A protein has these predicted regions:
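Conserved alpha-helix/loop element of class I SAM-dependent methyltransferases that forms part
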Residues: 1-20, 34
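Short glycine-centered segments of the SAM/dcSAM-binding site in methyltransferase folds
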Residues: 20, 44, 116-118
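Class I SAM-dependent methyltransferase SAM/SAH-binding core
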Residues: 22, 27-80
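A short acidic, Gly/Pro-enriched loop at the edge of an enzyme's catalytic core
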Residues: 79-90
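A short SAM/SAH-binding and catalytic strip from SAM-dependent methyltransferases
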Residues: 88-102
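A short glycine-rich, Lys/Arg-flanked "PGG" loop and its adjoining helix->strand segment in the class I
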Residues: 103-118
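Conserved class I S-adenosyl-L-methionine
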Residues: 118-134
Length: 134
């Protein structure tokens, strides 16, 4: 998958540019970059992942591609309470399927959203393969 594929997957879940969003389980940042592209300047993104090395690499990529975006990188476990402001939206791309018990995680995540906030899930379709699923 390339950047345009990531943008395409998120586009339908993002109704307008700007706002305060989080990418939970952001890994290497492919979807964080897509989110930055779609939200544009003036937005704020919280990128959360347990892998500090991945977050550092993500920060380098973001600075090179979107130097005017405000991104906060948090090395944390998104299944535990986080210090986040009320969010306009949350992206969880290929991170929820790692959670054995999804309901408590989704309840926690829902609590971060402002009224009317959006949760955008990107997950593998295990029933039908596609070019990007290993």
């Amino acid at each position: 998958m390339n950047h345009e594929d990531h943008v395409r997957l998120l586009r339908g879940g993002i109704s307008e540019p700007g706002g305060v969003w989080a990418d939970l389980g952001s890994g290497g940042g492919a979807f964080t970059l897509a989110l930055a592209d779609l939200l544009g300047p003036g937005s704020t993104i919280y990128s959360v992942d347990q892998d500090r090395g991945a977050l550092r690499e993500q920060e380098r990529s973001m600075s090179a591609r979107f130097p005017d975006r405000a991104v906060t990188y948090l090395a944390a476990d998104f299944t535990r309470p986080l210090e986040l402001p009320p969010l306009d939206g949350i992206v969880m791309a290929n991170s929820l399927h790692y959670q054995r018990d999804k309901e408590p995680v989704l309840r926690l995540v829902r609590g971060y959203l402002k009224p009317g906030g959006r949760l955008v899930l990107v997950e593998y379709n295990a029933d039908r393969g596609n070019p990007w699923v290993p």
